[in-house]
Amino acid sequence: TQDDCYLGMGNLRDLLKRLTELKIQNAQYANPLTLLPGNVPINNEVDSLLKETSDFHIAYFDLNNFKPFNDCYGYSKGDQVIRLLGELLTRFAGHDRNFIGHVGGDDFVVVYRSADWQLSCERILREFDQGVRSFYSPKDLQNEGMWSTDRKGVRSFFPLLGLAIGVVHPDPYRCESFHEVAELAAMAKKEAKRSAFSSLFVSRRRCTGIAN
């Protein structure tokens, strides 16, 4: 299909073979913590959609205050938080037209082809804010944050973990590859992370050129 229109009939055996190849590729590059597809399948998915000039949104998910949380509670609990986020993405963005990927660490992406991308992101934000509270001590919950050492070695107060989501709507006629889409998504995520708390930022930029 292209833009949800059938282009013609294909060979069923070839189709099944291609689906099997994609499953093997996704498993080969899957993140060991969440078992979600990694960078290579993500990049291939974006390139494929651009080639088909398909309409899609990309949401880039990243955690706020994750390093101080790891420093205070340990990497095992940090891994539990990452798995929680992966489960929420699968539950609330797992439409058969969408693609969920784990870039690495606490970074995830969802390639949305479903029309409910904004409702999905907002639901994930709410569920994350609620679910992440179970990982904190009663004292830190009461204080709505914790004391830890920042990257400069200074003792500082950090709010509870937040989820930053940057969303872009790439123009498939002006974006030539996943590199450009990744740049757009990274800029949107950077804007979302300006807040220390959970936030959703939707970028108006559709390509990396001067004219948008």
Model-based region annotation:
Residues T1-Q2, L16-L19, D47:
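The conserved cystathionine-beta-synthase
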Residues T20-E21, Q25, M187, E191, ...:
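C-di-GMP signaling machinery
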Residues G38-H57, K67-T90, G101-G105, V109, ...:
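Conserved long alpha-helical elements within nucleotide-processing catalytic cores of c-di-GMP signaling
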Residues Y136-M187, S199-R205:
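A short glycine-enriched loop-to-beta-strand structural element that forms part of the catalytic core
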Residues Q28, D47-F61, C72, R91-F99, ...:
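Nucleotide second-messenger and two-component phosphorelay signaling modules
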Residues G86-E122, R126, Q130-M146:
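Conserved helix-loop-beta segment at the catalytic/binding core of cyclic-nucleotide signaling proteins
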Residues T1-R13:
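A glycine-centered beta-loop-beta connector
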Residues T20-P41, P68-D71:
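Amphipathic HAMP/coiled-coil signal-transducing linker helices
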